[in-house]
Amino acid sequence: MLAAYEKNMLLLIDGFIASCAYLCAFNINPAIKNNALSCHLSDEKGHALLLNYLGEKPILNLGLRLGEGTGCALAYPIIESAVRVMNEMASFENAGVTNKK
């Protein structure tokens, strides 16, 4: 995670175990938070406490605890769509939308 952060890569944190690793990385370098997104809230009992401690809001809450990266696979299209909306969607001004009645 720290090496990925140093390369300015996006970190998709998926589940409880990955969040524990993220906590360790965060304790070494808190700036890692600028590159991290929590994909989902696991059904593991401590995960909500851990994410709350880190100030993270997960993208999804589906009660998963499969340990197979499923939350990341489900969150990725949402993240990709959000990036495209931010980068490609026209503003009202650019699209010629007015308040005239």
Please describe what each predicted stretch is:
Residues 1-101:
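N-terminal loops that bind phosphate or other acidic moieties
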